[in-house]
Amino acid sequence: MLPNEIAISVQGLKKSYKNVTVLEGVGFEVKTGSIFALLGSNGTGKTTIVKILTTLLKHDSGTAVVNGFDVAAKPDSVRQSISLTGQFAAVDEILTGRENLIMIARLRHLDNPRQVADDLLKRFGLTDAADRRVSTYSGGMRRRLDIAMSLVGESQLIFLDEPTTGLDPEGRIEVWKMVKELAGSGTTVFLTTQYLDEAEQLADRIAILHKGRIIVNDTLAELKKLFPPAKVEYIEKQPTLEEIFLAIVGKKEEKDNGND
């Protein structure tokens, strides 16, 4: 890929906390305008990677380039070109949806904050609830507002760190639809999740993080080719991402144990 087609480039990324190694030479690329899912169990280092890429945490060694800017050398430029939404919605429940958005637009010194807010409310299907306090919103609505707030200023790249944590099925589907729309409009989406069906539904490319390393990085279609379909009552049943994940992680565990 050409440099302007790559939103994120990571090579040999390492990070330790005291005597605990979290990342052991992680490397991957994310194509501009795509949805990239980083998949892994709790505690595997997904959030650590997000914190490094968003300049919230310094890595020990390796390189990380986001939107053409090295995260260590040009952190301010990185921050100006990205948005980050954490695992829990960071909204002010006392304010209305519109007031939350206007507040962020003013903090970012944008022209016509009210128009910015109205445009985002419409884009995220929140116009009818614009003047209600956020405390009355459903989980899915809060998450949509949270992501809308992170996009004030038209970021080229958004990091969604486990965006559907704590949401009911309806709320998760709301967020999935919105993520697809973001990518469709040209925004690059970096998604971390422990929900296999989420990655299966959304991602153009899936990387599996296990014990501090990326053990596989490919499209879902290519991952499925690693495992032949099973025949169930004369019908071919394609493997699910859950089956692929468990098989790959299981094989890696066997290999690691064999080397001990």
Task: Enumerate the language-model features and the residues they cover.
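ABC-family P-loop ATPase nucleotide-binding domain
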Residues: 1-14, 251-260
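ABC transporter nucleotide-binding domains
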Residues: 5-8, 15-191, 196-197, 201-210, ...
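Short, polar/charged, Gly/Pro-enriched helix-capping and turn/loop motifs at alpha-helix termini
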Residues: 92, 189, 230, 255-259
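Conserved NTP-handling cores and scaffolds of large molecular machines
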Residues: 108, 227, 231, 252-253
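Conserved beta-strand-loop-alpha-helix hinge in the C-terminal portion
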Residues: 213-237, 241
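Residue-level signature of catalytic and energy-coupling elements of molecular machines
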Residues: 245
